[in-house]
UniProtKB/Swiss-Prot annotation:
Cofactor binding remark: Binds 1 heme group covalently.
Protein name: Cytochrome f
Highest taxon in the source lineage: Eukaryota
InterPro entries linked: Cyt-f_TM (IPR024058), Cyt_f (IPR002325), Cyt_f_lg_dom (IPR024094), Cyt_f_lg_dom_sf (IPR036826), Rudment_hybrid_motif (IPR011054)
Keyword set, alphabetical order: Chloroplast, Electron transport, Heme, Iron, Membrane, Metal-binding, Photosynthesis, Plastid, Signal, Thylakoid, Transmembrane, Transmembrane helix, Transport
Pfam family for this entry, one: Apocytochr_F_C
Subunit-structure text: The 4 large subunits of the cytochrome b6-f complex are cytochrome b6, subunit IV (17 kDa polypeptide, petD), cytochrome f and the Rieske protein, while the 4 small subunits are PetG, PetL, PetM and PetN. The complex functions as a dimer.
Lineage, broadest ranks: Eukaryota, Viridiplantae, Streptophyta, Embryophyta, Tracheophyta
Residue ranges of the TM segments: 286-305
Gene Ontology terms, MF aspect: electron transfer activity; heme binding; iron ion binding
Residues making up the signal peptide according to the UniProt record: 1-35
PANTHER family from the UniProt entry: CYTOCHROME F, PTHR33288
Cofactor(s) required, per the database record: heme
Length: 320
């Protein structure tokens, strides 16, 4: 009898352990599915393809604008701001992974020239820290400090993201030169439509996989639909699964064609990319330019003085 009780207790503990493990896995998987910069980091060695396209566009299919603002020129070993703006209507709600509606998150990738990197905390001024807020930036790869990623973060609070950047010093980094450099940026608002494995998220349109009649629509207990489509020609039945989130456009008994949308498009977000240019300025050139301007001003002053002196001489000769 005691053996049975012991066995029953062990069985109960095993079931609990398995349940807890499954819950941890689901929670972890959900958080990863929302952390879209991770997809690019895991799947691509470089976030910018040879064509110039940033890989985030592979999952975020809608095209939306972004704006990048950087100084025209910076001096070596100087901290400056790179400001990314991701505009969108703050009243919009997106479909979450569970099918409910919620606010949009934003994320970004900033591709700097070689040698430029995230400014260390001790080099960031209090004013700049206030602009950054509670954002936490990370390098795309340990060996790619010039590529920074951020997100997902709440869009209502961080539709404008300020990156603190440290410019390189050619005196200590021999592979860096005083030149004009390009900066590339990509930013998205909202969840993607496709996962890296090619599967669809619930934030996109679902199309019919067969032509026929919608025979039955079964609403699932946890949300979503199971749609039975019967081919009128041969009676073959196809079942399309719709996850929670998208709204159905068809009712039972209606005809439908292959690839015709079964649902509305719930996506309200999108991805955009842009670029800018920045000059790593040589301080000696700046000093030379200032010296040139000063010499021009002095020359003008001496010219005016000489002219007045000449006029006085002419006036004296006329009076004489």
């Amino acid at each position: 009898m005691e053996n049975r009780k012991t066995f029953s207790w062990l069985k109960e503990q095993m079931i609990r352990s398995i349940s807890v493990s499954i819950m941890i896995y689901v929670i972890t998987r959900t958080s990863i599915s929302n952390a879209y910069p991770i997809f690019a980091q895991q799947g691509y060695e470089n976030p910018r393809e040879a064509t110039g396209r940033i890989v985030c566009a592979n999952c975020h299919l809608a095209n939306k604008p972004v704006d990048i603002e950087v100084p025209q020129a910076v001096l070596p070993d100087t901290v400056f701001e790179a400001v990314l703006r991701i505009p969108y209507d703050m009243q919009l709600k997106q479909v979450l992974a569970n099918g409910k509606k919620g606010g949009l998150n934003v994320g970004a990738v900033l591709i700097l020239p070689e040698g430029f990197e995230l400014a260390p905390p001790d080099r960031i001024s209090p004013e700049l820290k206030e602009k950054i807020g509670n954002l936490s930036f990370q390098s795309y790869r340990p060996n790619k400090k010039n590529i920074l990623v951020i997100g997902p973060v709440p869009g209502k609070k961080y539709s404008e993201i300020v990156f603190p950047i440290l410019s390189p010093d050619p005196a200590t980094k021999k592979d860096v030169h005083f030149l004009k450099y390009p900066i590339y940026v990509g930013g998205n608002r909202g969840r993607g439509q496709i996962y890296p494995d090619g599967s669809k998220s619930n934030n996109t349109v679902y199309n019919a996989t067969s032509t026929g009649i919608v025979k039955k629509i079964l609403r699932k207990e946890k949300g979503g639909y199971e749609i039975s489509i019967v081919d009128a020609s041969d009676g073959r039945q196809v079942i399309d699964i719709i996850p929670p989130g998208p709204e159905l456009l068809f009712s039972e008994g209606e005809s439908i064609k292959l690839d015709q949308p079964l649902t509305s498009n719930p996506n309200v977000g999108g991805f955009g990319q842009g670029d800018a240019e920045i000059v790593l300025q040589d301080p000696l050139r700046v000093q030379g330019l200032l010296f040139f301007f000063a010499s021009v001003i002095l020359a003008q002053v001496f010219l005016v003085l000489k002219k007045k002196q000449f006029e006085k001489v002419q006036l004296y000769e006329m009076n004489f």
